[in-house]
Amino acid sequence: MSENGFDRSTQDVGNILAMEHVNVCIPDQQLAQTFYAAGLGLTRDPYMMVGPENMWINVGQQQFHLPTREQPQVLRGTIGLVMPDLEALKQRLMTVMPRLDGTKFSCKADNGHVDVTCPWGNHFRIHAQGPQFGDMTLGLPYVEFLVPQGTASGIGQFYKEVMQAPYTLTQDMNVAVTKVKVGPAQCLIFRETSEDIPEYDGHHLAVYIANFSGPHAWLKKHDLVTQESSAYQYRFVDIVHPETGRKLFAIEHEVRSFTHPMLGREILNRNPSQNIGGYARGRDTFATVA
């Protein structure tokens, strides 16, 4: 605490500056467009990946990357989203429900948020904007993973010692939960469970970090780098205990430097309330706060 009463540590961010996207493969672009754009009200990126081999979906300053593959990928946990109007979201989801019949799609309003499952089984929890998400009005504030019992503490140590990102370890209903800070209004959450966890299928997330070489050196030394993508990017999959080397969890990280050419690119978000019957001139785009 400083002399003037400010706790400067509350403004620390850590080495991971932002989570940029979550990547899951999908087998059907038309279904994905119906769910992500018409249902959730998000926006297909008009500048990148506009062909049938992939689609990028914008959500504030973050994205979903959805490569077209025969086998869909399912994240082992929950993807958190913030949206400005949950009532409008509910109406959109009800509208697209008949078009998603026969898939794993479901939606349910519960305790101030909306729980949604995509056509292939990915789970989303959608919140209204609030102080727990900073000034984010539309975006991807967290991803929560279900992890084996006895791993949450070691996962936190990995992020602190290897990735240089601060974390907290708490108990929630007698379950250990690690929360890793990834930028000013985002986090990765690792919640222990006694239930069986599906085998990892290759989905990934992308982060930007400030100290790019330090984590790489540690990962390289321990033979954990899985791809040397470019001068600005590398990848790893296994999260290990930094002291024992025991594998704790698998989730591919696409690690980008703060000099990556795509950092800060303009991400367009449409206003999903616009329609032909009630069109408002000059309100096509949605102004977001990261």
Residue ranges and their predicted role:
Residues 72-77, 197-204:
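The conserved glycine-aromatic submotif of the RRM
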Residues 25, 80-84, 146, 206-210:
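Short hydrophobic/aromatic beta-strand micro-patches
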Residues 32-37, 121, 155-160, 219:
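Conserved active-site tyrosine of GNAT-family acetyltransferases
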Residues 26-30, 147-152:
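Short acidic-aromatic low-complexity motifs
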Residues 1-15, 21, 45-46, 87, ...:
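Vicinal oxygen chelate
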Residues 6-68, 75-78:
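An N-terminus-focused feature that recognizes amino-terminal "leader" regions
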Residues 70-95:
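Eukaryotic helix-linker segments that join adjacent hydrophobic helices
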